[in-house]
Amino acid sequence: MSDLRITLDPDFIAQTKKEVTPHWGELGWVTYKRTYARWLDDKNRSENWDETVKRVIEGNINLDPRLKNNPSKKTIHELTAEAKQLFRLVYGLAATPSGRNLWISGTDYQKRNGDSLNNCWFISIRPQKYGNSHIVPAYLTQDQVAPSMPFSFLFDQLMKGGGVGFSVVDENINQIPKLDQKVDLTIVIDKQSKSYDASLKLGATDLDEWKKTNQEKEDYIYYKLPDTREGWVLANARLIDMHFNSTNPENKKKLVLDISDIRPYGAKIHGFGGTASGPMPLIEMLFDINQILNERAGQKLTAVDATDICNLIGKTVVAGNVRRSAELALGSSNNQDFITMKQDKKKLYHHRWASNNSVAINSEFDNYQPIADSILHNGEPGVVNLELSRNYGRIKDGYQAGIDGEVEGTNPCGEISLANGEPCNLFEVFPFIAQKQGWDLKEAFKLAARYTKRVTFSPYDWEVSRKIINKNRRIGVSMSGIQDWILSTFGHRVVTGFKTATDSETGKEIKDPVYDPEIIKTVDGLYQAVVDADKDYSQELNCNTSIKHTTVKPSGTVAKLAGVSEGMHFHYSGYLIQRIRFQETDPLLPALKDCGYRTEPDIYTPHTICVEFPIKAANADSDNFASAGTVSIAEQFATQAFLQTYWSDNAVSCTITFQNDESDQIAPLLHQYRYAIKSTSLLPYYGGSLKQAPKEPISKEKYEKADNHITGNVEIVFEQTNEDQKGLELVDQSDCDNGACPIK
């Protein structure tokens, strides 16, 4: 029997559209239309919101493994009812799956690529076996350990649109053997290739010229790259592995890579979307990586070398147009070369921008001042406490030795602690909106837990991932718009004050936060609802319960859809101008102008138009409202600790902002919360002083004046013109303050 497929009835969708109004933020519909609405060739337009939600929910509900094995009528009925509930929840924007799911779920690409629904991944940079994976170099057996494997994993996941955290701590880097030899790399290309001239300028060699003097020789390895993602990965793997005797069985020192078949710049990429970069970025990457490896011949790679290789891979992937490479490098806290590697401005601008860098610590670590000094200068490194992640769920639940003992790092935004090869798996509920729309919050979080659980049954491409996902079934149910919800529901922020206390280990005076007990009780109840939902569904599916369940994701672009505060973060300002950049040919622009939005040419990027959106935060007029520009660094630390203690058993993504006069508090606060925060990062608060800044705080009066100029609904005006175009995106989006997340 073929798999049964659940679909949502058009009559149900039509009725829901009458009953439920999506909670679009001021930027919501425009952001959706240019980020997550897929092009429909048969209708010559991009999706509408109900079509996107239908695709996403159907793509998810049909992952339930029971549908593959003659499901009962009861199961079909229950899953159909659940799909309807999910549709209502997401259509109303009371909750959303991750941006990755909004873009990919329910597509043919999802069916072809088992990894496609997971936003981000983690891999340890040490020799590993490829195993029974979709990519295995022909010169290796599946069980052969190879230095190239983690780099191949990273390259593959980045090209599939995922972000990757990677670990270059001493314990991993020390496992890489010394490089045995240099490799003479030649990249050849046929004259018939449209990329011929551009490739020669970057150091490639004419194929016919090379054949004249080399074809009869036998001292080289030749590999012709197919025009596939896997071909790029395998070329890089061969280059890396040839430097090591254990993975160079022919013991040859010359590598010839033929790029003639790679599609040219501008050609369409089927599947994920976008247009091709041509082979030029790959040529640069391969030569750059080979230079790093050759310079280490006879020695061992350093953490900086490995990070450089990963950054060069990330830089190459960025050139693929629709993708934005997201990396987090995790190094040892005593490695000063790693901590200071971005101070080399030449290499920073060339490729080291491609990762956010953090250091791995434990709770005994106390040398925070050098970290604080570095943060003050360039906003890095972030801090990841692996000891807490391995031995704690929620801090409230106490020490549980090895409860997550295989954790080695995090995803790029730091909200999910991950084992080697493991992905994050995210869904977020906006309690502020869910309550307004009449949802029982526990029911909303239950639906979120079941959605993420189904994602773990995807047919994953890499053996290392399949094994750890099958074991851990990790999910990440997030709440977002937290500041809006707490202030609207409880009338004040979660931190009601501070009391003087003494650090039991150092004897120093500290200020302990005081939390509202009603908020503690509410959040704890929602956590239990997620755990109970996972337990019940795991029994239905006969699989392991999830090792961890909850998180707080940064929620940049997705929060814009619903118009709520991002994750746990405070609004940037009570009132602000948010500037969004559009390609100058975007047919949305006339609709925006007709509705009264201010537009002007972008001063930084040619052929780009900057549009100003006046934004008012929820509760902006409340006496208890605080923004990122007014809330203290101490309250932000305390708020993150609250969520780690009572809500998140994974971690909490937070970029704490600080004013110049608060910089001396960074090291003491990192030390104070060493037993309560699993990962964090900090950035100075800039306040939008740049011309055409993405966010510019403004007064209430200026907001009201700008808002009064807006006279129409962009969605309605745009649909009346019916002039949509394929392949348009917003220019230079950022999904969170530190730019760590892929947008979709």
From Swiss-Prot:
Residues 690-729 are annotated as: Adenosylcobalamin-binding-2. The keyword Glycoprotein does not apply. One of its GO terms (biological process) is DNA replication. One of its GO terms (molecular function) is ribonucleoside-triphosphate reductase (thioredoxin) activity. This is Adenosylcobalamin-dependent ribonucleoside-triphosphate reductase. Signal peptide: none annotated. Belongs to the class II ribonucleoside-triphosphate reductase family. Residues 169-318 are annotated as: Effector region-2. The active site is at C413, E415. It catalyses: a 2'-deoxyribonucleoside 5'-triphosphate + [thioredoxin]-disulfide + H2O = a ribonucleoside 5'-triphosphate + [thioredoxin]-dithiol. Allosterically regulated by ATP and dNTP. Disulfide bonds join C120-C424. Its cofactor is adenosylcob(III)alamin. It holds the Pfam family RNR_Alpha. Residues 570-631 are annotated as: Adenosylcobalamin-binding-1. Monomer. Keywords: Allosteric enzyme, Cobalamin, Cobalt, Disulfide bond, DNA replication, Oxidoreductase, Redox-active center. Its EC number is 1.17.4.2. Residues 148-159 are annotated as: Effector region-1. It comes from Lactobacillus gasseri (strain ATCC 33323 / DSM 20243 / BCRC 14619 / CIP 102991 / JCM 1131 / KCTC 3163 / NCIMB 11718 / NCTC 13722 / AM63). InterPro entries: RdRp_reductase_class-2 (IPR050862), RNR-II_ins_dom (IPR054158), RNR_alpha_hel (IPR040763), RTP_Rdtase_AdoCbl-dep (IPR013345). Gene3D superfamilies: 3.20.70.20, b-12 dependent (class ii) ribonucleotide reductase, Chain A, Domain 2, b-12 dependent (class ii) ribonucleotide reductase, chain A, domain 3.
